[in-house]
Amino acid sequence: MAVHQEKLYPNCDSGVWLRSCEEEVTEPLEGTITGEIPSWLQGSLLRNGPGSLKVGSMRFEHLFDSSALLHRFAINDGSVTYQCRFLQSNTFKKNRAAERIVVTEFGTRAVPDPCHTIFDRVAALFKPGESLSDNAMISLYPFGDEIYAFTEGPVIHRIDPETLDTLERRNLMDSVSLVNHTSHPHVMPNGDVYNLGMSIVQGRLKHVIVKFPYTEKGDMFAKAHIVANMSPRWPLHPAYMHTFGITENYFVIVEQPLSVSLLTMVKSQPSNEPLASSLHWYPNHETHIVLLSRRDGKEVKRYRTEPLFYLHIINAYEHDGVLVVDLCAYKDAKAIDAMYINAIETMQSNADYAEWFRGRPKRLELPLNATNCSRIEPRLLAQLGCETPRIHYDLYNGRPYRYFYAISSDVDAANPGTIIKVDTKTGETKTWCDTNCYPSEPIFVPAPGATEEDDGVILSALVWGGAGAHCRRVALLVLEARGLRELARATFCAPSPVPKCLHGWFLPRRTQL
């Protein structure tokens, strides 16, 4: 007789991350509306994230390896439609054609390709845009009137924001020789885009800031150029960074003690080892916060703080001689291990799993007149696990702000599927949740003519725990941003399971193609 094992986290259904979409939704589905969508809310919420863990009889080993699935919620005069399509990356097409995993991913080793010799694999080190996976399953960002899907490799993909077709593949090695970049560039009010990456500058590997100048006509990528650079703290172990900050006068680089070992990468290339094997956490080394001048691109000052791991910076700004950096911080990098598929499947029997994801929003206050390498102690902003944070981006990115919105990262919470609003001034928090419901990154959309920072709505994609019809259910949630009161939702029944998504972008109707 089978012994029933008690779940350590009975309120958390990890299955929402383990689903694989089996059928795309190319023709828009009409949603069932409850409540009332504000009449001014018109446009599309575009989402990106893991879509399928399966290729033939094989399975990916890490969540970041899952085939990219694009989602669209189109809002039009109070009604909403839903679509989803797989990103047609080279990696996706090669895997589907072979019916097996033939391109090594972040955490998954591909099957050997008999056509590739050891010399081919060594040569691949010098052309990462073509040899590495281009499975851009993390985020979506606008470059002018075009939308691109991002991962951390140098290849991005332009998508059609209405059909979700994959239109174009761009290798940034061709324009600014980026060997990698973050999944979260900054889009400025004038349309310029900045991103942090790595490039060879005067024969040395550097962390660089690249500017893509906005142009109404022409190619933003053709005019891309490096505007700032800094040497890694450890030349052969550059820090892994998923985001960066930008303020009025500075680019803000948080150099955490999680590094990518270049030597391990070189050694592992012939054996086809995944990138994750090159990541190393150094618990006895501090985190450095580096300020690069937006005027001349040079390093101005650096600060030290406790060892911490982060994926997302919430915001950064200057005020009264202090530069403030808010971020979602963890004590170590176990959160990456927690996203291995085996770890997700066995979490209910892993007493340490909740601690792996025990992140908290913290604030670093950097006096601009401090001596170089001053030590800064972080300050807790809220006693809640917060991830995929968003702010009123258009008006408050890089400027003094008060509110941010996030989803819970506490798997042992009473309801892990919670949307959180944090008041950084008072420490007050507001939450929204529903039974067995798992929201995605909450995106703030300002109301027309808004004068208050939180005058607008929050949009979030919802999925539900469970099997059968539950795993095919997906919805768009609309919350009033001030109090997180539910205004409306549009619910759909997809033809196959809908996995939980990661990041996205809202396109108001006026900016759509």
Curated annotation (Swiss-Prot):
Q: Which InterPro entries match?
A: Carotenoid_Oase, cNMP-bd_dom
Gene Ontology biological process: carotene catabolic process; retinal metabolic process; retinol metabolic process
Q: What EC number(s) are associated with this protein in UniProt?
A: 1.13.11.65
| Associated pathway | Cofactor metabolism; retinol metabolism
Q: Which EC class is the enzyme in?
A: oxidoreductase
Q: How is the cofactor bound?
A: Binds 1 Fe(2+) ion per subunit.
**What GO MF annotations does this protein's record show?**
beta-carotene 15,15'-dioxygenase activity; carotenoid isomerooxygenase activity; metal ion binding; monooxygenase activity
Q: Which cofactor does it need?
A: Fe(2+)
For binding Fe cation, which residues are annotated in this chain's numbering? H184, H242, H312, H503
Q: A Pfam family matched by this chain, by name? A: RPE65
Q: Catalyzes what? A: all-trans-zeaxanthin + O2 = (3R)-11-cis-3-hydroxyretinal + (3R)-all-trans-3-hydroxyretinal
Does the keyword Secreted belong to this entry?
A: no
User: What keywords tag this UniProt record?
Assistant: Iron, Metal-binding, Monooxygenase, Oxidoreductase
Q: Which family does it belong to?
A: Belongs to the carotenoid oxygenase family.
Its annotated function is as follows: Catalyzes the oxidative cleavage at the 15,15'-double bond of carotenoids and the simultaneous all-trans to 11-cis isomerization of one cleavage product. Carotenoids like 11-cis retinal can promote visual pigment biogenesis in the dark. Essential for the biosynthesis of the 3-hydroxyretinal chromophore of rhodopsin from zeaxanthin and for proper photoreceptor development.
Record-given protein name: Carotenoid isomerooxygenase
Protein's organism: Galleria mellonella
